[in-house]
């Protein structure tokens, strides 16, 4: 047997039936979809319907909830702040607040406030005023000789992680 002699077993591959090709084809007019209704239209799939089997979303238990007044903080890392200070876009000699951070382009929007995280190195002596910060970020800023003031309640800022 050679590669060019390979064939599917008899009946293993079924030819595709071309539908909506006239009345003589046996699948003309409605193309096997029946008459009218949602399922006869194009682009329709009944989401979550599994052919009568109990769908996955009903087999699994309900769990959790979404807090309606949840605070969403924009995250800024120390390394990024240092990069902007080095580039001259942030002035380390002046106090830096959330509006200055957004104006410099460190983050595009502040959402419910800005939360500073400790990723990266900080060498500049900064006076930061932000909504929240991680403990390691506060330690890194104070180690560099700077200070940080948190405007949001500590519990709210800590839960934003």
UniProtKB/Swiss-Prot annotation:
One of its GO terms (cellular component) is large ribosomal subunit. GO terms for biological process: translation. GO terms for molecular function: rRNA binding; structural constituent of ribosome. It comes from the Bacteria. Gene3D superfamilies: 3.100.10.10. Residues 1-51 are annotated as: Disordered. Keywords: Ribonucleoprotein, Ribosomal protein, RNA-binding, rRNA-binding. Residues 23-35 have a biased composition (Gly residues). Residues 1-13 have a biased composition (Basic and acidic residues). Belongs to the universal ribosomal protein uL15 family. Binds to the 23S rRNA. Part of the 50S ribosomal subunit. This is Large ribosomal subunit protein uL15. The gene is rplO.
